[in-house]
Amino acid sequence: MLEEKLLKKIKTINENFINLGFDLEEDFIELVTQREDIRDRIENTKYKKMTFSKDEEANSYILNLEDCQISFDIIEGEDEEGPWFEVECNIIFF
């Protein structure tokens, strides 16, 4: 279970992604649950130092921290059941 303070920060971060066009809260929670190093970076990076962007061409939503970039790549399609999407997360450390 994630701490309330971290969940609040994730909700605030997700508001930026929603403003860019996509709700990534569940995917973000899954990421910080699976990757302790990313959770620590999120907890220890001040919100003001985070930047957010969208790569329209790649359909990616990007969070830049001080020493890494997290991109959520959205793959969309349609089948006999209707439209679907998948989210793939990529992390680049600098």
Listing of model-derived features with the role each one plays in the protein:
Residues E25-F93:
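Acidic, low-complexity, intrinsically disordered interaction modules
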Residues M1-I38:
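N-terminal trafficking/processing presequences and adjacent post-cleavage segments
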